[in-house]
């Protein structure tokens, strides 16, 4: 098995850090060994495995894992919407809400993950924000990008969207991959203001979306279960916000109302237990990603940043 670490650039600290991987030995064995490969294709990628583990995380006894997890990963309990002692299960802790103001929304004079203001002026509306806490890869031109996880592998947009005509509209556009780890805040939000339509479910497997797995096969991203929501923005045009289920995360819950206008930074939904991923697609010429995201992504480094921070500006 390989011991290659996962490194990322921490935007706030301005340093490169090494990721502390939850369940690292299990993930590496599953994706980097012959024995693990047999288990992966026989059980781990299938919904029953994730269902069983998710079921266990809904047991009341699972609440005993909450405080040790907080301590081990040094989570900031001051930003939680309620006391960690009040979570009845580990899953309830996992998809926890945050206090208003815990995630300021870029381009808003006030606002938070819980309640962004309805409008912020013309300049603020031109700023898009990161849809989730996590490690982000920003590709300004998807058609020109190759090997961002492994050399020689290209992102198959038509397979990912499950719609060749829709893929053609985003060809040559920009893509953001936001990878959430189990230690992260697991609610996802709208990166732009606009009107979302009903999400479309594309069923699939539940492979890991860790770089440990994606360095082996990028196509796990379009083999996994996912949901695609189109958001019509008056500034950014049509934006596709896509949530991907992963090992131990078969449950993707949407909390927004289709057809109702949403504010930038407004909650869209949540993942239940595990690691997971959000992919955001923009049509060509509609956004210019921030330079730091593009620079580090080109170097093969994900950028750790939080929901509500700047993603880029309208093109």
Task: Identify the meaning behind each predicted range.
Residues 1-111, 119-315:
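Contiguous, well-folded functional domains in the mature portion of proteins
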């Amino acid at each position: 098995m390989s011991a290659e670490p996962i490194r990322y650039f921490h935007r706030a600290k301005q340093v490169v850090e090494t990721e502390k991987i939850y369940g690292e030995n299990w993930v590496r064995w599953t994706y980097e060994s012959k024995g693990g490969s047999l288990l992966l294709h026989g059980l781990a990628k299938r919904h029953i495995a994730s269902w069983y583990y998710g079921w266990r995380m809904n047991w009341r006894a699972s609440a005993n894992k909450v405080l040790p997890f907080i301590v081990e990963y040094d989570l900031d309990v001051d930003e939680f919407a309620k006391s960690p002692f009040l979570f009845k299960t580990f899953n309830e802790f996992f998809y926890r809400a945050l206090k208003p103001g815990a995630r300021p929304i870029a381009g808003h004079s006030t606002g938070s993950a819980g309640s962004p203001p309805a409008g912020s002026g013309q300049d603020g509306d031109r700023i898009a924000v990161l849809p989730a806490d996590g490690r982000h890869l920003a590709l300004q031109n998807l058609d020109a990008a190759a090997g961002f996880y492994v050399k020689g592998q290209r992102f198959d947009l038509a397979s990912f969207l499950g719609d060749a005509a829709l893929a053609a509209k985003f060809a040559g556009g920009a893509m953001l991959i936001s990878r959430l780890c189990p230690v992260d805040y697991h609610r996802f939000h709208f990166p732009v203001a606009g009107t979302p339509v009903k999400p479309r479910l594309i069923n699939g497997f539940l492979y890991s979306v860790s770089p440990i797995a994606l360095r082996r096969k990028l196509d796990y991203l379009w083999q996994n279960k996912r949901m695609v929501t189109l958001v019509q923005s008056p500034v950014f045009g049509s934006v596709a916000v896509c949530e991907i289920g992963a090992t131990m995360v078969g449950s993707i819950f949407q909390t927004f109302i289709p057809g109702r206008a949403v504010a930038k930074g407004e909650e869209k939904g949540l993942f239940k237990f595990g690691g997971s991923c959000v992919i955001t697609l923009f049509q060509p010429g509609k956004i210019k990603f921030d330079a730091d995201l593009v620079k580090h992504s080109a170097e093969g480094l994900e950028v750790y940043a939080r929901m509500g921070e700047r993603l880029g500006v309208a093109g």
